[in-house]
Amino acid sequence: SEVVHAGIYYPQGSLKARLCVHGKQLLYAYCAERAIAHRRCGKLIVAANEAQARELRAIEQRAVANGVTDLRWLTRDEARALEPALECQAALLSPSTGIVDSHGLMLTLLGDLEHAGGMLAVQSEVESLQVGVGASEGAIELEVNGAGEQTRLQARTVVNAAGLGAIALAHRT
């Protein structure tokens, strides 16, 4: 999505909330260090009426409980100073929400992986998976089918990026 999330909406103490709050700091630092295009552009969460303003206060409380420290409540006039065409009752500004060039980020992460001796197997289906086999104890052995070609891989660490199939793949061990 190319969005750097602040951790505003998730249930208090949830993994998503913790990862967003801590992860955004790490991501911004990594992007700056590696010259990956990104911007802390912020985000306005807008309440059009009094009922929505009450909901916005609940969102603010949840965010603060999750460790989001930079939210700012805006009056109608303060919000309009940022966005003159905006019609609202109130708004919540999240200045640490941002955007990142996901393509640049992925290429940089891939370079880091390869520099560390790792490899990426794209468009490959895991045919079999065994843990604790091979020369090194705890090794993971995979049989992978990529473009009709069977390959056997052995690794100490495997990142399961199977999307919606990730849980099913994890249960195959």
Describe the role of every protein-language-model region.
Residues 16, 91, 170-171:
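Short linear functional motifs in flexible/disordered or boundary regions
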